[in-house]
Amino acid sequence: MSEFSQTVPELVAWARKNDFSITLPTERLAFLMAIAALNGERLDGEMSEGELVDAFRHVSKGFEQTTETVTVRANNAINDMVRQRLLNRFTSELADGNAIYRLTPLGIGITDYYIRQREFSTLRLSMQLSIVAQELQRAAEAAEEGGDEFHWHRNVFAPLKYSVAEIFDSIDMTQRLMDEQQHSVKEDIAALLNQDWRAAIASCEMLLSETSGTLRELQDTLEAAGDKLQANLLRIQEATIGNAGLDLVDKLVFDLQSKLDRIISWGQQAIDLWIGYDRHVHKFIRTAIDMDKNRVFAQRLRQSVQHYFDNPWTLTHANADRLLDMRDEELALRSEEVTGELPPDLEFEEFNAIREQLTAMIEQALLVYQQQQIPLNLGEVMRDYLAQYPRARHFDVARILVDQAVRLGVAEADFSGLPAEWLAINDYGAKVQAHVINKY
């Protein structure tokens, strides 16, 4: 986290006093990026005024502007960028009025945002994390060795402040750029679906899979290095415990831990949000396909009717005999019950009536165990009962038995914590696990 030595009112007064302002229309921004691209090809990082005019000429051609006033407009743009502190101008008496221009840190930062930083590279992120791990390893070892104030400032505080913190800021910037890239991909997908969703399905799938893969790769890289980085930060923090003169180091370590937690949590949150968006797009495509089937059929039918005289067609349908209603109308008016005889296996019995009868019978039979204080072995009793009923009723009878048995009492063995043995209760593989009820 950055530490400002000035207060907000002081910064406001400073910006007003120095007349800070940045105005970059599309043309000027393109000119600045052209300068950065050409400047990257030079070893000295310097450009002459003539080279800047040539770069502006390319920009003017790209914007289809007139070529008659290129030199004047180029000089105005150069002077404006110098005033806004995007370019530094160096003049010399020996150069006879020819100036040399270099990009300022502000100009480099703006062009990096639009050119270099937008190119996400997992290899670059891996190298940054590797450098951070090495710096933290050395700082942790130096912290555990201990030393005077100069030792802590040179070997612990300085690497954390000027190397680790800056790389964390760079990773944070990469993640913020990934956020913008996701928004850009969403806009591209929306534009494709609005044009022709059938032709856009493949392109949408490619954009979704590429972004998902990039986010997953980023998160895997961060998680692989995150634990090791946190461990080294904890080593440094433990070494500062009990030393009041190391509050600055302890605060810096805490800030780095918070920043690392935020970086790692961002990765997982971004993946979760993207998965939700991915599902939303696929759901939209599936809905569009389902709706399109009916729409296409209706459209084809309408066109066929409209162009019948140009392209006659025939309609084929099944010609089956009519189904006559042979029911007796008087039979429907009769309200008396239809009587008849059915085999015993087909007779219908209401389940509630059967359950009430079984419950009463089982309750009366089990009551003997409570009155005479006889231990109730639920497995044996259940096996005897189930033998009296068909297999289809075993589950219902067993459930009623268990409900009535637990109302009578409890088993002292339940308090021992030992599991009961499994006992077979029928010949079809059913088993029950219950202690003997001996306390009513």
Curated annotation (Swiss-Prot):
The keyword Lipid biosynthesis does not apply. Residues 208-236 are annotated as: Leucine-zipper. Interacts, and probably forms a ternary complex, with MukE and MukB via its C-terminal region. The complex formation is stimulated by calcium or magnesium. It is required for an interaction between MukE and MukB. Involved in chromosome condensation, segregation and cell cycle progression. May participate in facilitating chromosome segregation by condensation DNA from both sides of a centrally located replisome during cell division. Not required for mini-F plasmid partitioning. Probably acts via its interaction with MukB and MukE. Overexpression results in anucleate cells. It has a calcium binding activity. The keyword Cell division applies. Keywords: Calcium, Cell cycle, Cell division, Chromosome partition, Cytoplasm, DNA condensation. It comes from Yersinia pestis. The lineage of its organism: Bacteria, Pseudomonadati, Pseudomonadota, Gammaproteobacteria, Enterobacterales. GO terms for biological process: cell division; chromosome condensation; chromosome segregation; DNA replication. Its main location: cytoplasm. Pfam families: KicB, MukF_C, MukF_M. Belongs to the MukF family. The gene is mukF. GO terms for molecular function: calcium ion binding. This is Chromosome partition protein MukF. It is found in: Cytoplasm, Nucleoid. InterPro entries: Chromosome_partition_MukF, MukF_C, MukF_C_sf, MukF_M, MukF_M_sp, MukF_WHTH, TonB_box_CS, WH-like_DNA-bd_sf. GO terms for cellular component: cytoplasm; nucleoid.
